[in-house]
């Protein structure tokens, strides 16, 4: 649905009614959404990843969001191990997101993980998470931060027997790399005070799995030296802070575990990161002071 006449950074409502006269929609206040505003001085967002249908863990990780009011929550891949039906996504975490985040007006930013490529219903991913590009890679601006969302695709070669010859992820990564060249040379990217990459998988080392090596070969040359401030990933199911250049990039990479929530606050001066466990305790912290890149 194309909505016109919306106001930046203010609550907006759209109510769609059917013939169900007297249904619950008449008995509750309509939910609101807050539109993106590039003039916003600070952006706060949370990230969870690798839920793999552990909905009870997901609920613990986002339960404080309605009170904290982050600008959005990023679901950074692998919501389920494979998607066989529409119900798979709902049971994995979207049902809880609709009960906890939606009434609070907190939107989602979603990346596709490698496991989202698996299962009979995998091809419907973009039906639930449409993007401005019509692809699983896209960009958006929230406050001072320009976000690049990338799809690392599968972690194994396309000819792996588990894919039944149905995937062409090598070509999809090449397609993204070409698109990425235009993104990092765009006025929108260059004008942003903060630049963050969201991707489920991480650029690899020489001994990494195939997909990670392809990410390094194709994506890293387009990202390194371009003024990226931070990359946020998942996939490993454990925490890593990588700032030693071992992945071929000149910016830090934070890999979030599958049991924690990453809370990020960014403005023109820098980025603050807190890793919070299911009990609500901060277990890791980082500060990135903004440099002129």
Label every PLM stretch briefly:
Residues 264-293:
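A short C-terminal boundary segment appended to hydrolase-like catalytic domains
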Residues 53-59, 81-85, 112-121, 155-159, ...:
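Active-site environment of divalent metal-dependent phosphoester hydrolases
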Residues 1-32, 87-188, 218-224, 240-274:
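Extended active-site neighborhood of metal-dependent phosphoesterases/phosphodiesterases
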Residues 46-49, 72-78, 106-114, 196-200, ...:
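Active-site neighborhood of phospho(di)ester-bond hydrolases with catalytic His/Asp-centered motifs
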Residues 42-43, 71, 137, 144-145, ...:
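Alpha/beta-hydrolase fold active-site loops
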Residues 163-171, 187-233:
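Active-site-proximal segments of metal-dependent phosphoesterases and phosphodiesterases across multiple
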Residues 4, 8-87:
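N-terminal active-site segment of His-dependent metallophosphoesterases
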Residues 31, 73, 231, 274, ...:
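Generic beta-strand hydrophobic packing signal
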